[in-house]
C-alpha cells in the first residue's frame, strides 16, 4: 500500500500521540493535521498546540475544538437514558467519547482532503476497535493508520527512548516517572498501567484525581435536586443549565463527597481482562437520579423491557458499535420510553454515596390511594387479587399434578 500524503491524527499532546506524530512524519514523509478534542478533560489544551507546532505542524493544520456540549448532549445523555452500565459496574466513560472523536477525524479529513486518519490506541485495547469501527461506519473508504500495530516501539521504555532521541518533551509526575496511562473527559477519568496491572495490589491513593477519599469527604451530607425532561437532566436545584454545565456541576459535587470511584477488572472486546481505576463522580449521581425519576414515571412493562435490553445496548457502546443500526434501533426504543420521564429527584450525597430520598412528577404513575395501608375509599378491591392469583397459579397446579402422576408410575 502506498504511503499516505496527508493524515489527520487524533492528538492529545501526550507521550503516545506526540511520538506518533513524529513517526508519521519520518515513516511516511506525509503532511500531518492534528485534531485535539476538548471533552472536558480538565487540562489546558494550548500546550498541545505549542507541542504540535514544535513538531513541525502548520498552524492551519492544528485543530483544537471545544466539543463538550455536543459530547454530553448527543452521546452521554442518550446513553444515560438507557441507564447503560457495562458488566454491572462500568459507566462507559472512555467508550462513549470515541465515536465523537472519530466523527470529527473523518469530517476534518474531508475538509483537508486527507487520505487517512490515525489514532494512538494500542493493539491490545478496545479503543482501536472503537475508533476504527466508527470511522469506517462514517466513511467506508477512509484509511486508518494504527502505529501501535505497525511499529517496533512495543513498550513504554522504547517509547521514552524514541521521544528522547527526537527531543519530544515528556511530562513527569511528582514521583519522577512518566504518568499513568490516563484517559479523561467530562464524564470520567480512567487510570491504567504500572502497579494497576497487578489486580492483587490495592491501587495507591494518588491514582484518584477527581474524587476525594471517602475518609476525607465532608462529615455533613448535602442534599441536591435534579430535574429531568424526557429523560435528560435540565436543572440542578431549580437552576436551568446546559448539558455540559450540569455534568460539570455534578462532577464537582460528586468529587467533593467521594462519589464514583471504581476499581474494576473488565472483559475487553479483544478477549483479555484488564484492570482500571475509574472516577465518574457526576455520572454516578446522574445515573442514580435518572433511575429515581423513572421509578415513578415509567410503566412497569416498558421499564422491564428497557432493563432487559440495557446490557446489549451497553455492550454495543463498549465494543465500538455506536454508529451501528442495532444501536440506533435500541436508542429509538429507549427514547420512546422517556416521553414521560419528567420530574425532580432529591438526592443525599454523603461519604461516597448518592442516594435518592424523594422524587415527584406531574407525570407520576404512583397512586397513594392504591398502595396505602389506610382506608383507600374503594380505590382498590382486595378481592380482585383472588382471581388474579388463581389464573396465574393454574399452570403451576397443572405442572404439579402432572409431575405427581408421572412420579407415581
Curated annotation (Swiss-Prot):
GO terms for molecular function: argininosuccinate synthase activity; ATP binding. ATP binds at residues 10-18, 37, 120. It catalyses: L-citrulline + L-aspartate + ATP = 2-(N(omega)-L-arginino)succinate + AMP + diphosphate + H(+). The lineage of its organism: Bacteria, Pseudomonadati, Pseudomonadota, Alphaproteobacteria, Rhodobacterales. This is Argininosuccinate synthase. Pathway: Amino-acid biosynthesis; L-arginine biosynthesis; L-arginine from L-ornithine and carbamoyl phosphate: step 2/3. InterPro entries: Arginosuc_syn_C, Arginosuc_syn_N, Arginosuc_synth, Arginosuc_synth_CS, Arginosuc_synth_type_1_subfam, AS_cat/multimer_dom_body, Rossmann-like_a/b/a_fold. Disulfide bonds: none annotated. It is found in: Cytoplasm. L-aspartate binds at residues 122, 126-127. SUPFAM superfamilies: Adenine nucleotide alpha hydrolases-like, Argininosuccinate synthetase, C-terminal domain. Belongs to the argininosuccinate synthase family. Type 1 subfamily. Pfam families: Arginosuc_syn_C, Arginosuc_synth. L-citrulline binds at residues 90, 95, 126, 130, 181, 190, 266, 278. It is an enzyme of class 6 (ligase). It comes from Ruegeria pomeroyi (strain ATCC 700808 / DSM 15171 / DSS-3).
Amino acid at each position: 500500500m502506498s504511503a499516505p500524503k496527508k493524515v489527520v491524527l487524533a492528538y492529545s499532546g501526550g507521550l503516545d500521540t506526540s511520538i506518533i506524530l513524529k513517526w508519521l512524519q519520518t515513516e511516511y514523509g506525509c503532511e500531518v493535521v492534528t485534531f485535539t478534542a476538548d471533552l472536558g478533560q480538565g487540562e489546558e489544551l494550548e500546550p498541545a498546540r505549542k507541542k504540535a507546532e514544535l513538531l513541525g505542524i502548520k498552524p492551519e493544520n492544528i485543530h483544537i475544538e471545544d466539543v463538550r456540549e455536543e459530547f454530553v448532549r448527543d452521546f452521554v445523555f442518550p446513553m444515560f437514558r438507557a441507564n447503560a452500565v457495562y458488566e454491572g459496574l462500568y459507566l462507559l466513560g472512555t467508550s462513549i467519547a470515541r465515536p465523537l472523536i472519530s466523527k470529527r477525524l473523518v469530517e476534518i479529513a474531508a475538509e483537508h482532503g486527507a487520505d487517512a486518519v490515525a489514532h494512538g490506541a494500542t493493539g491490545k485495547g478496545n479503543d482501536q476497535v472503537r475508533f476504527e469501527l466508527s470511522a469506517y461506519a462514517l466513511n467506508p473508504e477512509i484509511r486508518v493508520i494504527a502505529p501501535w500495530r505497525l511499529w517496533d516501539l512495543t513498550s513504554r521504555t522504547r517509547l521514552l527512548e524514541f521521544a528522547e532521541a527526537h527531543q519530544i518533551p515528556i511530562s513527569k509526575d511528582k514521583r519522577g516517572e512518566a504518568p499513568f496511562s490516563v484517559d479523561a473527559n467530562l464524564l470520567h477519568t480512567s487510570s491504567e498501567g504500572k502497579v494497576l496491572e497487578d489486580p492483587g495490589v490495592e491501587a495507591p491513593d494518588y491514582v484518584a484525581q477527581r474524587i476525594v477519599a471517602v475518609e476525607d469527604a465532608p462529615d455533613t451530607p448535602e442534599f441536591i435536586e435534579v430535574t429531568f425532561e424526557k429523560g435528560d437532566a435540565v436543572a440542578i436545584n431549580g437552576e436551568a443549565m446546559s448539558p455540559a454545565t450540569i455534568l460539570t456541576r455534578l462532577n464537582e459535587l460528586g468529587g467533593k463527597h467521594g462519589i464514583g470511584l471504581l476499581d474494576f477488572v473488565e472483559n475487553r472486546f479483544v478477549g483479555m481482562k484488564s484492570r482500571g481505576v475509574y472516577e465518574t463522580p457526576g455520572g454516578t449521581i446522574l445515573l442514580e437520579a435518572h433511575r429515581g425519576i423513572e421509578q415513578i414515571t415509567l410503566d412497569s412493562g416498558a421499564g422491564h423491557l428497557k432493563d432487559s435490553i440495557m446490557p446489549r445496548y451497553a455492550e454495543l457502546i463498549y465494543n465500538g458499535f455506536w454508529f451501528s443500526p442495532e444501536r440506533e434501533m435500541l436508542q429509538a426504543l429507549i427514547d420512546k420510553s422517556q416521553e414521560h420521564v419528567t420530574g425532580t429527584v432529591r438526592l443525599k450525597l454523603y461519604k461516597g454515596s448518592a442516594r435518592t430520598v424523594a422524587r415527584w412528577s406531574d407525570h407520576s404513575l404512583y397512586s397513594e390511594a392504591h398502595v396505602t395501608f389506610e382506608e383507600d375509599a374503594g380505590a382498590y378491591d382486595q378481592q380482585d387479587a383472588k382471581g388474579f392469583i388463581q389464573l396465574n397459579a393454574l399452570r403451576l397446579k397443572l405442572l404439579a399434578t402432572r409431575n405427581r402422576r408421572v412420579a407415581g408410575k
